[in-house]
Structures are given as C-alpha cells and as structure tokens.
C-alpha cells in the first residue's frame, strides 16, 4: 500500500501525513440513488469507492472517505434518491477541501463517480484555484472508462444502470446484482426550444423517465466486461 486512508490512521499519524506536499483524494459517488430493479441504490458509491481504493493502493495519496450525497437532479422523482442542490453541493465540497488548504495542502484529486456532478465540480476547481491557489483535478468516470466500454459493450445506447454499470458491479459486488431483474429500456430526452435575445436555446430534459429507471441494456452484462472496463 503506497497511499493512506485517513479514516484508518491516528491523529498523530495524520499530522505527519498532512503537509504542503500531500495529495488529497476525495471520492464522490451516490450512495442512495436508484439504479433500476437489478442494481443496488449505492451502485455509484461502490464503484467510486473501489476506484479510490485502487488509486490509494498504487499512489502516494491521502484518501478521504467516499462522499455519498451530491448533485443528482435527474433522480428527484425516484424515492430514496438523495439530491443536493448545486450551490449547496459546491459549498460543501469547498468546505471539505478547505479543511486541508488551511494546513498548507494545495493538491487535490476528486474522483467523480457521477455525470451531473461534473460541471459543478469543474466550476469548484476554478474557484479553489482563484481563492486559495489550490489545484483540484476532477476525474471524468465516463471519459476514463469510455474507450474500454465502447470496445466491449454491445448496447445501442446507455448511461444509467446499463450494460456498462451492471458489468462493473458484477465484477466488484456480484452478490448485490439481481440479473433476473435486468431490463433493456432507453430514456426519452425531450427538447424544449425557446427564443432568447434573438437566439434559439435548446433545453434538454435530463430527468430519468424510463419505467424501471434504466437507460441502456443491462441484460447484456457479464462480469468479464466489468473487469475489462475497470
């Protein structure tokens, strides 16, 4: 193990670890968000936590506990799915990072396990640079896994509870996956056109509107694809 999980060390050890050369890792993955009838509500949390553990095993970083709640507006209509408004979410994450900035830390990695969270976190990255001189790198899970997923996945479209996500969960937490409940369904994305200041503006609804809360074909998922994607 090259890195350190902050939750596993004592306060004196923490004091030794935290300095101007420290790289802090903050994983963010929804711990209570619908993922269809076949995947657990904590799917994003499990995947992000796994990626954080792998990063910590390989790199000299100090990793914080995975943050389970974030900005997920597409799921406000689904019972049990926790959503934090964008401004509150950005302030919350800023407070977390500033807890280390005040002790000289200037380098951070956010492992972003979401899609809707990416823009708020990119904005926060600029804020942290402008206010504190801190560098915050925000990963893009879809970007990191996209090339591998394109090579191994067969679904015609996807994005949530789909072939890719189901395959990954089968690779890391197979006991939580109910493949007998897997479905193929695709989200409709209605576009509302408006004219503002002489320009056409398109507003695309991102709400999850499929019957089971899946966008893609989860029935095509095996563990082996998940291992390749990871």
PLM region descriptions:
Residues 1-87, 91-109, 115-230:
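Extended, histidine- and acidic-residue-enriched regions that form the cofactor-binding/catalytic faces
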